[in-house]
Amino acid sequence: MELVLKDAQSALTVSETTFGRDFNEALVHQVVVAYAAGARQGTRAQKTRAEVTGSGKKPWRQKGTGRARSGSIKSPIWRSGGVTFAARPQDHSQKVNKKMYRGALKSILSELVRQDRLIVVEKFSVEAPKTKLLAQKLKDMALEDVLIITGELDENLFLAARNLQKVDVRDATGIDPVSLIAFDKVVMTADAVKQVEEMLA
């Protein structure tokens, strides 16, 4: 199959298995959930009554005070006491093998092509690391919410995009399923397309 280059009067021949396969929604969902779960820190921690700092002495005698009986200031029902079912640091990551991950990326790329959300260009760059230059270039292309993928990371382009809220710049090795579906449009250079094809082959 062929992808039309927007900035040149030509087309790029690409593999149909990468850019023309059926959309596997269940697979994409599983991989996206696993990717997001893997990004969680999982470092939250709370203290049980055994771990809270404080005396182990009984606050007051059992009977005769008129107050409710109490055995510890570290009780979970006391203010500043321990937590009954305290959270523990945990690993939230889910296992996804390479075949599934690559299959999900191919499904997403193919769906982007079908929805006309993938724009392929010969090259994409700015003359200087200026946000204004990139903003004008995107405006001329009628792009606002966009992921730009280049063969090699262009430092000028990367620096120019840092202050644009709905614009992200990655090299071909830095793509992931979440970023591909998070933006309205994806701009890829011809070099990036070839690299992605090789990665997913």
From Swiss-Prot:
Residues 44-71 are annotated as: Disordered. One of its GO terms (molecular function) is rRNA binding. One of its GO terms (cellular component) is ribosome. GO terms for biological process: translation. InterPro entries: Ribosomal_uL4, Ribosomal_uL4-like, Ribosomal_uL4_dom_sf. Transmembrane segments: none annotated. Keywords: Ribonucleoprotein, Ribosomal protein, RNA-binding, rRNA-binding. Pfam families: Ribosomal_L4. SUPFAM superfamilies: Ribosomal protein L4. One of the primary rRNA binding proteins, this protein initially binds near the 5'-end of the 23S rRNA. It is important during the early stages of 50S assembly. It makes multiple contacts with different domains of the 23S rRNA in the assembled 50S subunit and ribosome. Forms part of the polypeptide exit tunnel. Part of the 50S ribosomal subunit. Belongs to the universal ribosomal protein uL4 family. NCBIfam families: rplD_bact. This is Large ribosomal subunit protein uL4. The gene is rplD.
